[in-house]
Curated annotation (Swiss-Prot):
This is Uncharacterized protein ZK892.6. It comes from the Eukaryota.
Length: 237
């Protein structure tokens, strides 16, 4: 994800310069933990609506991106649904990229999402684009366990070591601080399982709009699930 967090000049290509990405340290596996989960009982808007605006857009480098509801930035239900629990949906609608995008769309205000097949993706590729350098990476991980539907959910207890984690890496464009980028993928123990990688970019016109996005959950502008694949599968997760 990329996110412009305040008003300012438009970013420019850096002609191949990039800032290395730090490697993350993730907790070791530990079996036998209490099955203590958020969203074991699902309901509400998340299960009935699609956060994406279809059809997908095409960036200058040929990669596909999706415009989406701003709540996706912090919504672990949607993130896990399309990254892990029903990741095949993205490939079925033709939005799974085989390369990391070179740059986000250059808009004054947007939030957009790239799904990338992470089999051949390295940290160097993630850190290299045509708009960097980026700030130091802020790394977080949320423990995951399977629910009764065999779907991964975020655990309530943050002090326990789980087998899987939802890994997040967040950074800000140094030359244009209103643009943020977030990587998300599933971690397994000490390993990075980047079979499907999510890159979200978020841009706002002014800095206070970013604060509103992070603190206040404003009224969402969701679309009904109109794509036939989402209609067929929306009730399963």
């Amino acid at each position: 994800m990329y996110d412009y967090t305040c008003e300012g000049r438009t970013p420019r290509p850096n002609f191949g310069l990039y800032k290395p990405l730090k490697k993350g340290n993730f907790p070791k596996t530990n079996d036998g933990m209490q099955h203590d989960l958020v969203n074991d009982v699902l309901g509400g808007k998340s299960s009935k609506y699609c956060p994406f605006i279809l059809p997908a857009g095409i960036a200058n480098d040929g990669t596909f991106y999706l415009k989406l509801d701003s709540k996706f930035w912090n919504d672990s239900y949607w993130q896990l649904k399309y990254l892990v629990n029903q990741s095949d949906l993205i490939e079925e609608i033709g939005c799974l990229n085989t390369q990391v995008p070179e740059a986000p769309p250059f808009w004054k205000r947007h939030i957009c999402l790239f799904f990338v097949d992470g089999k051949d993706v390295t940290f160097c590729l993630l850190a290299t684009d045509k708009v960097g350098p980026w700030s130091d990476i802020e790394e977080t991980s949320a423990p995951l366990r399977f629910d009764y539907h065999n779907h991964l959910r975020v655990c309530v207890r943050k002090d326990t070591i789980q087998e899987f984690q939802l890994c997040t890496m967040d950074s800000t464009l140094l030359s244009c601080p209103r643009l943020r980028k977030k990587y998300m993928f599933k971690g397994a123990g000490n390993n990075m399982d980047m079979a499907c990688l999510c890159i979200i970019t978020l841009s706002v016109e002014k800095l206070h709009q970013l604060c509103n996005l992070n603190i206040n959950h404003q009224e969402s502008h969701l679309q009904d699930v109109t794509h036939p694949i989402f209609k067929k599968r929306s009730s399963t997760c």
